């Protein structure tokens, strides 16, 4: 089943961020990655307590991002890391999390993450996006090539919308990560329905 994941960016959100997370969960998103890297670890942990509670109430899987100590203290089941941080994790730390995702930007990255024992990877950015201003997307041929060699689920990220999501799916990914669209849209339920209808 093709999954849709929400990668958060509270600075893009015009309404109360926690309310938006709740709305996205209620709309049936397949998972949330709480990516708020500008926060200090104590600030992130404080936010994560509330987000994890919302996700648990809605039955939505939630991965905490970057801050390993906070994730361990909150008994998070899923952790998402940049590749360099994942490779620096000890085996005992890895075992603390049933699911660990890794952000990758090349086939070499994906191979390294796989060899390190990750659960899944995100791969991007696939299309040009305001989140990576001035940088061209890596494209669908790149995505297809990586998917052919990957032995773990690959989730595409970067500029994915209803106009291109079917082509992303056809490249062989397990799902897509949506950031700005779900943070800024008027109605997350309607937005997700449009994405699923396009598949």
Description of each model-found segment:
Residues 6, 83-93, 122-134, 162-198:
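Glycine-rich phosphate-binding active-site loops on the catalytic face of alpha/beta enzymes
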Residues 7-11, 37, 67, 84, ...:
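Active-site beta-loop-alpha junctions enriched in small/polar residues
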Residues 16-31, 74, 84, 107-124, ...:
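Alpha/beta enzyme core
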Residues 30-39:
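A short beta-strand-loop structural module common to alpha/beta enzyme folds
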Residues 33, 63, 80, 101, ...:
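Conserved beta-strand positions in the central sheet of alpha/beta enzyme cores
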Residues 44-66, 83-86, 91-106, 134-162, ...:
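Alpha-helix-loop-beta-strand connector modules within alpha/beta enzyme cores
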Residues 62-77, 105-117, 149-156, 160-178, ...:
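Catalytic cores of alpha/beta
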